[in-house]
Amino acid sequence: MKSATKSKILCIHGYAESGELFSVKLRALRERMADSVDFYFPTGPIELDKAKDELNGSGFDALSTVFSSSPASHRRGWWRINEYADTKQLEPTKAFEYLASYIKEHGPFDGILGFSQGTNLAANLAALVTIPKYQEYFSQPPFRFALFFSGYFRPLLMDGAVHATKLDLPTLHLLGKYDTVLSTETSTTLVRACKDAQVLFHPAAHQIPAPHAYVEPAADFIDFFSREDWPIISKHISLIVPTKKVNTTSAQTSLNNVEHDLISKIMSRSFKGGINVVVSDLQMFNEYKRIFGPKVLSLVVTDGQEPDTYSENVHYTPNFKGALAYLEAYQNSIGRIYVIGDKKLLTLGMLCRCTKRIIAITDAEDKFISQSSAQQVSGSLPFLEHSKEWLKAKSSQIRQWTGQSRLKHMSQDNSGEPVTMKLQMWERL
């Protein structure tokens, strides 16, 4: 792919770091997207000194702990943390001037990415360039998307005033479950400032997590929002996550039938707006097609595979974008929309501003069970594994949604031991 066709992302490093160091930390993502994205890493204009800039008195004192892990040559910042006390507003003039010069030389950019202190600067910059005056100053049109690692938000001054405190663009927030530098409450300030926020928890602290915990969903997010304007569906799209089929014993077959009946009730529930649609890949369609009744239209994403036979009442499309285009064209005659499929479909469904509900089968400890291996899925979709951290509907609401009152049935784990499976539903934040 030619460089001219690549998307460009501006990456803003954290406190007491540098663009060079941040580039190293994002190596896995850079390599994953080398053919489609160019990442740019400016270095903050403020040279930091451990003796002067690791001071108390700031609401973000804990950020100074990064000094212990940053080489002296990489200790740069966008402003000094002791200049930004809880009661003080800050105008980081040097940071804005430097970024304006940097963007003029290397931009404009499609997206913006930040870590820690860099998320606050990135969020404020993204808000500013929605204003024509500052689009001209920074030589940057509104960003199409943003990714925030360990983020927080406090308004920064520009020309002596706060101009925007809300972000109306797709954002992906990656938060460490064990972050002791920024509290969940502090991180929530940025989530709440974003109109279209997607949140993924990863099993790490205040850091860029291990590649398996973020690269695939981040790459899917960037690919979706950077390439072109994809179809937007006004209706809610729900994910259905089935249990993993571990064996084919008669007992397991019976239990699978219970789950099939449960999913059938969910998908075939009548809706006055039109016929229900279920989006799946070929494997999932072949497994569940017998339970799709006349009230359900199957929309199958072939992804380069050729169906053995072409079934009636089924629309085949080569990719997920084609599925969205079909749903957009016929959404006035569609009732409810469901996605049931492998990790790729689930991730795309979650990150494409479509999904409002997740319907999943879990074990008694709320551990997510999937068609993919637990390690793969917990890396891409860790919030499902830690369901208690997310808003869940009441049992009465779940019963109304599923059309039946029995929310549990018995299944087996990989060793054949019996486990209690539970139907649960999450609302997207």
UniProtKB/Swiss-Prot annotation:
This is Uncharacterized hydrolase C22A12.06c. Keywords: Cytoplasm, Hydrolase, Nucleus. Pfam families: FSH1 (PF03959). It comes from Schizosaccharomyces pombe (strain 972 / ATCC 24843). Its EC number is 3.1.-.-. The active site is at 116 (charge relay system), 179 (charge relay system), 206 (charge relay system). It is found in: Cytoplasm; Nucleus. One of its GO terms (molecular function) is hydrolase activity. InterPro entries: AB_hydrolase_fold (IPR029058), DHFR-like_dom_sf (IPR024072), FSH-like_dom (IPR005645), LovG (IPR050593). One of its GO terms (cellular component) is cytosol. The keyword Iron does not apply. Belongs to the AB hydrolase 3 family.
